[in-house]
Amino acid sequence: MIEPALVALRFAAAFGCGLMAGLFFVFSVAVMGALARIQPPEGIAAMQSINRVILNPLFLTVFLGTALVCFLIALTSLWRWHEAGAAWLLAGALLYLVGTFLVTMLFNVPLNNALDAATPASPDAARLWADYLSTWTAWNHVRSITSFAAMAALMAGLYLQARG
């Protein structure tokens, strides 16, 4: 039998992964396409604004909190490897930590920082914006897929542990 605190932790991780998957999915299928249809100076300015507004307490709590909980789940899954569902829990935690959190920190955030330093009306704006759109969106697709897969793996682990 698993402890209620571990169940709550695992559920919170799955829920957080699902929230992040939804956010990234919307950017991949709607927001970035809409921004690509407007002129580069306006697109750059809009994305700069989005990048500033999204750094709010609720987003940061879900994004960073899910990473912290996934780190704890990875550790407990290794320590409790003999339990049903441990491999799924570890896989889900690692998918989020590597495919969502690390991808964000290593790829999307530096791209956002470079865009933030740009002047929307500069002569290089069109090239910068085209490069940003393709590269940032590709990495966002990775985050969308891995956060969804992390949620599914965590839910599978929860299900298997509930069955015993």
Task: List where the protein language model places each region.
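Core segments of transmembrane alpha-helices
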Residues: 63-73, 146-151
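Hydrophobic alpha-helical transmembrane segments
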Residues: 61, 131-148
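Internal alpha-helical transmembrane segments of multi-pass membrane proteins, especially GPCRs
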Residues: 11, 52, 90-91, 134, ...
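Juxtamembrane boundary at the C-terminal end of a transmembrane helix
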Residues: 159-164
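Structural signal for membrane-spanning alpha-helices in multi-pass inner-membrane proteins
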Residues: 24, 70-77, 104, 154-158
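Hydrophobic alpha-helical transmembrane segments of integral membrane proteins
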Residues: 91-113
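Interfacial loop at the N-terminal end of multi-pass membrane proteins
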Residues: 7-8, 19-64, 110-134
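Interfacial segments of alpha-helical transmembrane regions
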Residues: 3-18, 75-99
